[in-house]
C-alpha cells in the first residue's frame, strides 16, 4: 500500500559479508526505473563504483576450471561478471544443488538441458554456482556463461581467459538472442577481451569490421561447447 502513496521506491541490495551493494529503482514517478547504482563498502562508508567490470574481474583466473565471464546488463548499465562453478561427485547421498547470486530453479533447468541435449551426466553430482562479488543477477543472458562454467568444472578444463559470452539458453538447447548486444560486446572489447560468444541471430546488423574483438556466433549448446573446448 505504501508503494502506491510515495513517488519513488528504492531497493538497496547486498549482504554484510560482501563489499558490493546495488541500489535499484523499483518505482520512479519522475523518471526511468531501468537504472541502478553499484557501491562498494569501505571503512569510510559507501563509495560509488564507476567501473564495476574492472572490480568484479580483478581476480586472475587463467588456467582455472569452472570460471566463465558473462556480459550482463542490469538496468541500463552493461558490466562483466565472473561466473564460478564447482562440480564434484556426490559422496554424501543425494546430490547437492546450490546457487549464490543466481536463481536456483533456473540453474536446475540448465542442468537438465545439459543432461538431455548434450549428454553430460550430472544427476549424481554436486553442483555449486557462485556469481563473484556477491551480486544477484537476473539477466537471462548469463545462461551461456553458467553452463560454460559448469561444463568447465565438470571436465576440469579451463576456458581461455580472454573469452567473454552472452546468450539465453532455451529448453531445446538453443541459444536465444539477447537484447542490447552491441553494449555487451563494447564492454568486453573495452576491457581487452579477444573473443565473444553470442547467439547467431544477434550477429545480424553488427558491423564486424569496426570491432577489434572476434565474434563467435553459436546456435546450440553443442556449438558453444566445441567453440570453448574444441
Regions found by a protein language model. Give the residues of each.
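Peripheral, non-AAA+ core regions of ATP-driven protein-machinery
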Residues: 1-230
